[in-house]
């Protein structure tokens, strides 16, 4: 959640952020009113409790004649203190509920508007050209006997798939390539849980506007995560971190699950938008003063991956109205998909400032000895969807695919993915 002090001292900043997002400003007014009521209720409770304590001392010192009256007054005060405490607790809960309805305050410079109002940061790499009619990734995958959508649907339903043979090897190679880069950069690898408690899912901000995209196991009251960001954010919940040596950085590898609610009819062909996939997620805990620099660092790691995979891509600064509730700024990295004649998102990186840490109780101790919320950031370093861009970008006329040089060590030195028919004919 946002900093209550910012809400109290600068509600105009919160209102401006809501306007950039195209979101309700009434929730800000409601939170300001709830904060005022909480402070009034707490002041009343503390005043009555102090009066109760003072009367208790008088009873101890009173003579016999005055004690009955003073004891009666103490009993009356006790009832009033109990009632005031309940009102203070109710006011605290109301404030917490109101604060949780306010998304993160966007960072200066984030473009206003919705999904189509992003700002271009840069375009990198020449778009691939072909002297033949390029095939889409699913057709290539079928030629390679690498992707099986039919059996995925037979076993699990729409938007499920099998990666087979070289398809499975390609995904594992891609993930291992990302992991090697993460290790090189000093990130600590984690295999994360894919089932988390409601308070962790809510703490990361995934039970707000996008709650309908999350799978829930009703009998166990656990959520399936759509990204290891959730488990990585929860890893240090209710802890005080030592950032004296710099940021704490992780790379979480997990299977991810998404309902893809609201995407009916979109990307029904192939593996661009599926219910289950693999993802390697970077996650950083940093001093809030260093958060924007860390954001650029994560983006640079993602761009290096794109370049080494030989992909043409662009970076966009996502508009405020297209940000999730936790993000104060998000960069999307979109690769060129030849058969769609369009850029499609392959990865993103978000600066969540202290929003998630406040919800999850994750703090660090500053030089003055005081504790305060850390900043959290995340970004994807490899995921299943990248196979789409790799297959389409590096395809050849005979249905084979050139393996990007950087990926070859993770495929046993393989330089070309050959059509299954060609291999069978040998």
UniProtKB/Swiss-Prot annotation:
Its EC number is 6.1.1.11. Belongs to the class-II aminoacyl-tRNA synthetase family. Type-1 seryl-tRNA synthetase subfamily. Homodimer. The tRNA molecule binds across the dimer. GO terms for molecular function: ATP binding; serine-tRNA ligase activity. The keyword Aminoacyl-tRNA synthetase applies. It comes from the Bacteria. InterPro entries: aa-tRNA-synt_IIb, aa-tRNA-synth_II, aa-tRNA-synth_II/BPL/LPL, Ser-tRNA-ligase_type_1, Ser-tRNA-synth_1_N, SerRS_1_N_sf, SerRS_core, tRNA-bd_arm. ATP binds at residues 258-260, 274, 345-348. It holds the Pfam family tRNA-synt_2b. It catalyses: tRNA(Ser) + L-serine + ATP = L-seryl-tRNA(Ser) + AMP + diphosphate + H(+); tRNA(Sec) + L-serine + ATP = L-seryl-tRNA(Sec) + AMP + diphosphate + H(+). It is found in: Cytoplasm. Consists of two distinct domains, a catalytic core and a N-terminal extension that is involved in tRNA binding. Keywords: Aminoacyl-tRNA synthetase, ATP-binding, Cytoplasm, Ligase, Nucleotide-binding, Protein biosynthesis. The gene is serS. Pathway: Aminoacyl-tRNA biosynthesis; selenocysteinyl-tRNA(Sec) biosynthesis; L-seryl-tRNA(Sec) from L-serine and tRNA(Sec): step 1/1. One of its GO terms (biological process) is seryl-tRNA aminoacylation. Catalyzes the attachment of serine to tRNA(Ser). Is also able to aminoacylate tRNA(Sec) with serine, to form the misacylated tRNA L-seryl-tRNA(Sec), which will be further converted into selenocysteinyl-tRNA(Sec). This is Serine--tRNA ligase. The keyword Cytoplasm applies. SUPFAM superfamilies: Class II aaRS and biotin synthetases, tRNA-binding arm. Its main location: cytoplasm. It comes from Clavibacter michiganensis subsp. michiganensis (strain NCPPB 382). GO terms for cellular component: cytoplasm. L-serine binds at residues 227-229, 281, 380.
């Amino acid at each position: 959640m946002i900093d209550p002090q910012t809400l109290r001292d600068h509600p105009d900043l919160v209102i401006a952020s809501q306007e950039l997002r195209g979101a309700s400003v009434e929730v800000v007014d409601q939170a300001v009113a709830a904060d005022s009521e909480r402070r009034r209720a707490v002041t009343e409770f503390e005043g009555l409790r102090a009066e109760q304590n003072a009367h208790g001392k008088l009873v101890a010192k009173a003579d016999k004649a005055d004690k009955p009256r003073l004891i009666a007054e103490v009993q009356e005060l006790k009832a009033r203190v109990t009632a005031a405490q309940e009102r203070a607790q109710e006011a605290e809960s109301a404030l917490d509920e109101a604060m949780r309805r306010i998304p993160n305050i966007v960072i200066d410079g984030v473009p206003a508007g919705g999904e189509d109002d992003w700002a271009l940061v840069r375009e990198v790499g020449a778009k691939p050209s072909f002297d033949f009619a390029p095939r889409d990734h699913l057709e290539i995958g079928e030629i390679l006997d690498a992707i099986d959508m039919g059996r995925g649907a037979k076993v699990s339903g729409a938007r499920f798939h099998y990666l087979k043979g070289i398809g499975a090897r390609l995904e594992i190679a891609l993930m291992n390539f990302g992991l090697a880069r993460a290790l090189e950069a000093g990130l600590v690898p984690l295999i994360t849980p894919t089932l988390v408690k409601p308070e962790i899912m809510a703490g990361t901000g995934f039970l707000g506007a996008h709650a309908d995209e999350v799978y829930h196991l009703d009998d166990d009251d656990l959520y399936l995560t759509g990204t290891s960001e959730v488990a990585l954010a929860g890893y240090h919940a209710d802890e005080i971190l030592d950032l004296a040596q710099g940021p704490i950085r992780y790379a979480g590898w997990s299977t991810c699950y998404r309902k893809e609610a609201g995407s009916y009819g979109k990307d029904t062909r192939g593996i661009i938008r599926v219910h289950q996939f693999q993802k390697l997620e970077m996650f950083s805990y940093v001093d809030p003063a260093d958060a924007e620099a860390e954001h650029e660092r994560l983006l640079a790691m993602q761009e290096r991956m794109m370049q080494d995979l030989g992909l043409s891509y662009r970076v966009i600064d996502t508009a405020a109205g297209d940000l999730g509730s936790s993000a104060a700024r998000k960069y999307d990295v979109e690769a060129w998909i030849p058969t769609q004649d369009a850029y499609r998102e392959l990865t993103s990186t978000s600066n969540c400032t202290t929003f998630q840490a406040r919800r999850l109780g994750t703090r660090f101790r500053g030089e003055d000895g005081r504790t305060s919320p850390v900043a959290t950031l995340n970004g994807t370093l490899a995921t299943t969807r990248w196979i789409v861009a790799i297959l389409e970008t590096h395809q050849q006329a005979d249905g084979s695919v050139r393996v990007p040089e950087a990926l070859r060590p993770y495929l046993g030195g393989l330089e070309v993915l050959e059509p299954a028919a060609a291999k069978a004919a040998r």
